[in-house]
């Protein structure tokens, strides 16, 4: 019996996982416009003191609380992973203030612990955690924005400036101005689900893939087969006649087309896009960020005791975040490697290893609308939409979106 044809546009976690779960029963073809496979799973092999080391710049960590499908996925692939560190620091150089939640010493034995504003931050962290538990399943705050919720509950400016907004900006790679307009219920759900409201007990264990996240990408590449990965940009999807046209002018027919790209890219390639499809894809916008892999320590906290896995630097116009890759990936090299977002003008040119462009979703107040509209458009004309934008924007969300499609068409 002839296998049905499945075309997958995009080789991020959504596209790759869909390919993995379908390739045995379907004739699967994956199209990727970039030179590398993986999307935000992006590992770079760099040379440090004559030693080659794999460093990630996109997807880095996952945990045992919220990535259950992803853990099952990589365990099936027999991919090794190890415990990581997920500490966080905030630096505000204008106000000569920095803190880290790395350990007991950095929290309670630092110079900051002697200041009133520091204790305001701690007090409001406990207050926010308590309110999250109180409102997580409540309709009372279902329509409130982040800004409205924080104002009505009278959180201190110190809490907002030195904890809450830096944390949210770092998690979603969005500036504070955008975070203020997020739906508060979206934030409360995320903080609760990810154990961020648990100070001591029930904290998630964080992991990183050994030797770089590209390990699972390479495994899927081998299993699905090199011939089924096509490095061509998809220019158009003809929904009525069920074929695609690529940048090389080639035509490929399909029974099912899984669009595992960002929403803005999906809109561009859909020929005769339906009104419902357009409404769905317009619900999630994307904004670009520049990531720089480098060795410049100047963007880190001045006090090295505060160096953490994630390091937020306050800036007037935009957020800046630096990942300390040695700590996150357990790198055993004698040089510190960092990946910074929105720090272009702060990093010395002779310290730069690589620049990478990424786009991240900007979440609106339409979470439930997205789910409802998805149910209406999925599978129409054999076209399916996958992507982390259907959830919180992370690896598990992308994988879950693919699993829902696989369940429907397999």
Model-found features: residue ranges?
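Conserved flavin/dinucleotide-binding core of flavoenzymes
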Residues: 100-102, 318-410
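Helical element adjacent to the flavin cofactor pocket in flavoenzyme catalytic cores
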Residues: 187-243, 247, 252
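N-terminal glycine-rich dinucleotide-binding loop that anchors FAD/FMN and/or NAD(P) in oxidoreductases
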Residues: 44-70
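Mobile amphipathic helical/loop "lid" adjacent to a hydrophobic cofactor/ligand pocket
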Residues: 64-189
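Conserved Rossmann-like nucleotide-cofactor binding loop
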Residues: 14, 36, 264
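N-terminal Rossmann-like FAD-binding beta1-loop-alpha1 element of flavoenzymes
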Residues: 4-30
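Mid-domain catalytic core of redox enzymes
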Residues: 235-361
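Glycine-rich FAD pyrophosphate-binding loop
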Residues: 23-47
């Amino acid at each position: 019996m002839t296998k049905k044809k499945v075309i997958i546009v995009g080789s991020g976690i959504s596209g790759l996982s869909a390919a993995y779960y379908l390739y045995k029963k379907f004739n699967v073809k994956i199209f990727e416009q970039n030179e590398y496979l993986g999307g935000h799973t992006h590992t770079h092999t760099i040379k440090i003191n004559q030693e080659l080391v794999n460093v990630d710049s996109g997807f880095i960590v996952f945990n045992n609380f919220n990535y259950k499908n992803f853990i099952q996925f990589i365990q099936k692939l027999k991919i090794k992973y190890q415990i990581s560190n997920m500490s966080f620091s905030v630096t505000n150089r204008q106000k000569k203030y920095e803190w880290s939640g790395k350990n007991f010493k950095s929290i309670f034995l630092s110079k900051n612990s002697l200041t009133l504003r520091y204790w305001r931050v701690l007090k409001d962290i406990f207050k926010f955690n308590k309110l999250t538990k109180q409102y997580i399943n409540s309709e009372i705050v279902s329509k409130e924005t982040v800004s409205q919720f924080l104002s009505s509950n009278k959180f201190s400016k110190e809490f907002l400036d030195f904890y809450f907004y830096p944390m949210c900006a770092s998690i979603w790679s969005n500036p504070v101005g955008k975070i203020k307009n997020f739906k508060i219920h979206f934030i409360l759900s995320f903080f609760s689900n990810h154990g961020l409201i648990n100070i001591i007990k029930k904290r998630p264990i964080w992991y990183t893939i050994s030797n770089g996240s590209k390990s699972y990408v390479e495994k899927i590449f081998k299993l699905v087969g090199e011939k089924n990965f096509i490095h061509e940009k998809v220019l158009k999807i003809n929904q009525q006649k069920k074929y695609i046209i690529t940048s090389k002018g080639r035509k490929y027919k399909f029974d099912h087309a899984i669009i595992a790209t960002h929403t803005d890219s999906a809109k561009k390639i859909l020929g005769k896009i339906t009104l419902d499809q357009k409404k769905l894809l317009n619900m999630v916008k994307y904004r670009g960020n520049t990531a720089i892999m480098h060795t410049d320590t100047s963007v880190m906290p001045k006090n090295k005791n505060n160096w953490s896995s994630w390091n937020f630097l306050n800036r007037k116009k935009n957020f800046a975040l630096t990942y300390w890759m040695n700590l996150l990936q357990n790198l055993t090299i004698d040089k510190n490697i960092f990946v910074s977002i929105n720090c272009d003008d702060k990093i010395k040119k002779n310290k730069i290893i690589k620049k990478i462009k990424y786009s991240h979703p900007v979440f609106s107040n339409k979470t439930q609308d997205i789910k409802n509209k998805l149910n209406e458009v999925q599978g129409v004309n054999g076209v399916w939409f996958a992507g982390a934008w259907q959830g919180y924007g992370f690896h598990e969300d992308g994988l879950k979106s693919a699993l829902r499609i696989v369940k429907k068409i397999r």
